[in-house]
């Protein structure tokens, strides 16, 4: 597909926005889903200070800004800020005219209907998109893994979902949502680093801790054993250089933070871990398809990127499932972007071209057209 008419694929996550052109194998733009506003009145006249900053620019000026994430737990909560993010995506990141390209956007499973309508309305009325489609994130991850049946464990920055999919259709009655994801692990890491005497509190410092988490954390296969190893030797310790040049040492925090995915009680949440949630989701499905789900457990999203997570998942699910069951955890190396990749695949299929909602259909039917065309 030529860039001129290529469809745009935009995956709006709670933490990062991934955007690019259908047919590409990776998103061209990946930036934080952040809108920042100045904390103080600008006093330098003629500095050209803006009233808001988006993405990396907001991130780099975080010292003087208040940062807000318009997507909370995977669902858009602030539409004005969301519009700013889309505007930034089209004009600054991809440098395209939105009225010239069909756009495929993604949504969280169990997204409220009103949100889907609002998204459709903004795309057609604010950005004059010629054609539009909205797809469920987990379904796209499954496509990206080359499957049409399986259960997707999609864990990002704001929310985790387990989504069983059969022959390309998500089974809504069996989708489970867990409000425990990357942002909670970052917060927990901030807390346990404070116990070590390092103090992180501001929104700017939280980003440093997020970086520590992404670089140094991993999932232990046996948590108790790992705690024992960490207390008796320094083999698990790693050092990290802060922006000001100070070097800090981090030990058992490396695996204590991600452990919350399997034991949410350590962050004070009364809920099942990701292994139990996956199991419960499978158990809500028809008994005849469970075998296919157990053998196709697909991980997706940035919070599944910890080293060791697939092995731990295999161990935990094996303990829960019937003993004869074949269990396969699929953790593709590009899973951080698999939702976007699935969108890129879908939007470039010739069979998909009749699925778009056109501007004309929108003008005739209004935003509710989205329920008939996208499911």
Swiss-Prot record:
Record keywords, A-Z: ATP-binding, Cytoplasm, Cytoskeleton, Hydrolase, Nucleotide-binding
Origin superkingdom: Eukaryota
Entry-linked InterPro entries: Actin, Actin/actin-like_CS, Actin_CS, ATPase_NBD
Gene3D superfamilies found in the cross-reference section: 3.30.420.40, Actin, Chain A, domain 4
Pfam families xrefs: Actin (PF00022)
GO molecular function, one term: hydrolase activity
Annotated compartments: Cytoplasm, Cytoskeleton
Main location: cytoplasm
Gene Ontology cellular component annotations, sorted alphabetically: cytoplasm; cytoskeleton
EC number(s) stated in the UniProt entry for this protein: 3.6.4.-
Catalysed reactions, as listed in the record: ATP + H2O = ADP + phosphate + H(+)
The protein's role, per its UniProt record: Actins are highly conserved proteins that are involved in various types of cell motility and are ubiquitously expressed in all eukaryotic cells.
Family per similarity comment: Belongs to the actin family.
This protein's name: Actin-1
Source organism of this protein record: Pneumocystis carinii
């Amino acid at each position: 597909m030529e860039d001129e008419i290529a469809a745009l694929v935009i995956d709006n996550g709670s933490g990062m926005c991934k955007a690019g052109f259908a047919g590409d194998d990776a998103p061209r733009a990946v930036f934080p889903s952040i809108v920042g506003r100045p904390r103080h009145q600008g006093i330098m006249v003629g500095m050209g200070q803006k009233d808001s900053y988006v993405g990396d620019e907001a991130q780099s000026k975080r010292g003087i800004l208040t940062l807000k994430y318009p997507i909370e737990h995977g669902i858009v909560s602030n539409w004005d800020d969301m519009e700013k993010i889309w505007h930034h995506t089209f004009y600054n990141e991809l440098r395209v005219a939105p009225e010239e390209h069909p756009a495929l956007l993604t949504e969280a499973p169990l997204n409220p209907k009103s949100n889907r309508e609002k998204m459709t309305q903004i795309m057609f009325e604010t950005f004059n998109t010629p054609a539009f489609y909205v797809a469920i994130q987990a379904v796209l991850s499954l496509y990206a893994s080359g499957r049409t049946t399986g259960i997707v464990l999609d864990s990002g920055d704001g929310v985790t979902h387990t989504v069983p999919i059969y022959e390309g259709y998500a089974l809504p009655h069996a989708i489970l949502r867990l409000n425990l994801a990357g942002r909670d692990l970052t917060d927990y890491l901030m807390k346990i680093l404070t116990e070590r005497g390092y103090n992180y509190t501001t929104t700017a410092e939280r980003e440093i801790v997020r970086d520590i988490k992404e670089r140094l954390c991993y999932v232990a296969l046996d948590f108790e054993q790992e705690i024992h190893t960490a207390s008796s030797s320094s083999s698990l310790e790693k050092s990290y250089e802060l922006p000001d040049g100070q070097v800090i040492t981090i030990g058992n925090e490396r695996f204590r933070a991600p452990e919350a995915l399997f034991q949410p009680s350590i962050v004070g949440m009364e809920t099942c871990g990701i292994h139990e949630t996956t199991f419960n989701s499978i158990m809500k499905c028809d008994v005849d398809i469970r075998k296919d789900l157990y053998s196709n457990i697909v991980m997706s999203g940035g919070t599944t990127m910890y080293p060791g997570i697939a092995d731990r998942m295999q161990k935990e699910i094996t303990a829960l499932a019937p003993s004869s069951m074949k269990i396969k955890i699929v953790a593709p190396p590009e899973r951080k972007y698999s939702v976007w990749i699935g969108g890129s695949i879908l939007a470039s299929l010739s069979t998909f071209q009749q699925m778009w909602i056109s501007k004309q259909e929108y003008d005739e039917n209004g935003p509710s057209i989205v329920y008939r065309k996208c499911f």
